[in-house]
């Protein structure tokens, strides 16, 4: 009973932002993140696209508020005889220099048995001493991942196979005056605010659909599935620091955005002000209740 009461209580959005910032949701591999959202939101369900969706109210008009979950990342593209992994970048929109952020960094490989820590190798400074520097910038094609395996069998024993998702290791960092730094911190903080707002909102007349959508970076499949399955909508609110225009809005209606101020966007230290997450949850709660 106590555990049930905890689930029914609205979570504190700032600590939840830190928690979500420590999770990984590579485009096309958001299932674990969706599982967590479903646990946090009693009554929410997984739709055919893989979104976590909570429907409030009934009838017209219908409105949608959506927060994207996905992030740029990689999959295991090859497993060498010596146990090293090679990578392919997952398709979709990515920030500039995304591959260069990978070189020499800790990564997490998500295998059948869960998270496997690993590292992306760098050139040996001893073996390359006296040679000219690399002319071309580092790319995913030059990445070799070491997870401590000595051969293919040890890779398999770790639960890692081809197409296993790979992303930078998540180590959310709090610094300064209530600042949170982590990859895609803006999206994670926005989704935390929406989870909190969804818990105790009183929806306006009609239907309000709250969706945590997948594959936004690739084809907006999650958002478009929500539009086709639950729309048409008169209004849509996107909780996302990405300001890319929605050109095929169709039945999304009037599209607006809510976002936190983000510094160093698209980098491993993307930074958001944690003290602004609770006010964002308040604005989202007001929107769900029929406010502008």
Q: What are these model-predicted stretches?
A:
Residues 2-292:
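N-terminal hydrophobic/helix-forming segments and targeting peptides
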């Amino acid at each position: 009973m106590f555990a049930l009461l905890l689930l029914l209580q609205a979570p504190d959005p700032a600590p939840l932002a830190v928690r979500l910032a420590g999770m990984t949701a590579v485009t096309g591999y958001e299932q674990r993140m969706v599982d967590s959202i479903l646990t946090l939101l009693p009554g929410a369900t997984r739709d055919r696209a893989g979104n976590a969706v909570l429907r409030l109210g009934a009838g017209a008009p219908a409105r949608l508020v959506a927060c994207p979950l996905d992030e740029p990342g990689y999959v295991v593209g090859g497993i060498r005889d010596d146990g090293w992994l090679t990578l392919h970048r997952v398709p979709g929109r990515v920030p500039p220099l995304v591959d260069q952020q990978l070189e020499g960094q800790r990564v997490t490989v998500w295998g059948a048995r869960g998270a496997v820590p690993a590292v992306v190798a760098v050139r040996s400074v001893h073996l390359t001493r006296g040679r000219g520097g690399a002319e071309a910038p580092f790319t995913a094609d030059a990445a070799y991942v070491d997870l401590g395996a000595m051969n293919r069998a040890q890779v398999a024993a770790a639960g890692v196979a081809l197409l296993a998702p790979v992303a930078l290791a998540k180590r959310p960092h709090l610094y300064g005056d209530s600042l949170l730094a982590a990859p895609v911190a803006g999206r994670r903080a926005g989704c935390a605010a929406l989870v909190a707002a969804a818990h105790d909102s009183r929806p306006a007349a009609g239907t309000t659909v709250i969706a945590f959508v997948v594959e936004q970076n690739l084809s907006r499949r999650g958002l478009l599935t929500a539009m086709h399955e639950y729309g048409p909508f008169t209004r849509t609110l996107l909780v996302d620091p990405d300001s890319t225009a929605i050109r095929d809005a169709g039945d999304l209606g009037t599209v607006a955005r809510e976002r936190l101020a983000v510094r160093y966007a698209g980098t491993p230290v993307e930074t958001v002000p944690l003290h602004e997450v609770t006010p964002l949850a308040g604005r989202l709660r007001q929107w769900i209740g029929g406010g502008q």
